[in-house]
């Protein structure tokens, strides 16, 4: 595998998002009026698109079905400037996203082919300086083993690994010990998580940081400041600038990761990279769905 630096690779889910915006309360057993759109989705795919949009050389690695939906989402990623490497089997995954008036979203994922990734060719990892892995990819199927293998190979070639905790559901289903073991196995340079995920796992606690001294935790908190935490170092607090016109939080965490990692690839220090993450997230929450305003 080439050790040439410069590529941000993102591996994991590429799905079709079905986004339903409603200003009415959901009524069990009844209906609520909504505006519905379809678009590319998946945390890993979102990070790749956002990173490419700000000029980072970006590659996506994943699995979609040999179907029309798979053709469509691959074509969309390619059109956004992403170097797309996918295996084709099963059926393309779908996520139903319900967005309320406040912009908050509830997601109903069917990962389908996303869980079926197998071992990837060395050429797919050539030139990778940073490999970003949302934890969604470690949920089920053959994909977790493929992602672990990718992380091992990237680190062996001198690259670095980034992970995003992704969802408190994963913590609820698998337990904090599962996440702890995964972090110990992947040896990420950065662990990004929102406030609920930080609380569920105790990522800001001395015990957790001491167990994983190799990792810098990026503890996001929505409109509140992001904390940068690392064992033995003082906490760095980076304020979030106010955002007017927020519509939809879908993809905000993905945009933060893309902005942060793209700035890191450019050689920016961690505080500057966090500011870049905030700025890209602000553009996403002012748009509908996981898109940039």
What are these regions (language model features)?
Residues 1-9, 32, 153, 203-293:
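Conserved phosphate-binding/catalytic region of the ribokinase-like
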Residues 1-63, 68-72, 246:
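Glycine-rich phosphate/adenosyl-contacting loop at the front of the ribokinase-like
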Residues 1-14, 76-87, 99-235:
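Ribokinase/PfkB-type carbohydrate-kinase core domain
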Residues 51, 194, 253:
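Short, conserved phosphate/pyrophosphate- and ester-handling motifs at nucleotide-, phospho-/glycolipid
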């Amino acid at each position: 595998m080439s050790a040439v630096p410069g590529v941000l690779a993102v591996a994991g889910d590429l799905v079709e998002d079905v986004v339903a915006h409603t200003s009415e309360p959901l009524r069990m057993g009844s209906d609520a009026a909504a505006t519905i759109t379809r678009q590319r989705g998946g945390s890993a795919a979102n990070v790749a698109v956002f990173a490419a949009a700000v000029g980072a050389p970006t590659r996506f690695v994943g699995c979609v079905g040999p179907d029309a939906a798979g053709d469509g989402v691959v074509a969309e990623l390619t059109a956004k400037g992403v170097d797309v490497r996918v295996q084709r089997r099963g059926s393309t995954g779908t996520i139903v996203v319900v967005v309320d008036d406040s912009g908050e979203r509830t997601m109903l994922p069917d990962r389908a082919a996303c869980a079926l990734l197998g071992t990837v060719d060395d050429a797919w990892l050539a030139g990778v300086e940073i490999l970003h892995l949302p934890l969604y990819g470690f949920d089920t199927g053959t994909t977790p083993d493929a992602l672990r293998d990718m992380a091992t190979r990237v680190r062996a070639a001198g690259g670095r690994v980034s992970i995003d905790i992704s969802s408190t559901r994963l913590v609820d289903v698998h337990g904090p010990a599962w996440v702890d073991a995964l972090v110990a196995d992947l040896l990420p340079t950065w662990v990004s998580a929102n406030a609920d995920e930080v609380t569920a796992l105790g990522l800001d606690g001395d015990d957790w940081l001491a167990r994983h001294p190799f990792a810098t935790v990026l503890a996001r908190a929505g409109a509140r400041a992001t904390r940068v935490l690392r064992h033995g170092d003082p906490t760095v607090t980076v304020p979030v600038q106010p955002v007017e016109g927020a519509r939809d939080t879908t993809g905000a965490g993905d945009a933060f990761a893309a902005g942060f990692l793209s700035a890191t690839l450019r050689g920016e220090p961690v505080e500057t990279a966090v500011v870049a993450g905030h700025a890209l997230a602000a553009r996403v929450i002012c748009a509908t769905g996981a898109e940039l305003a």
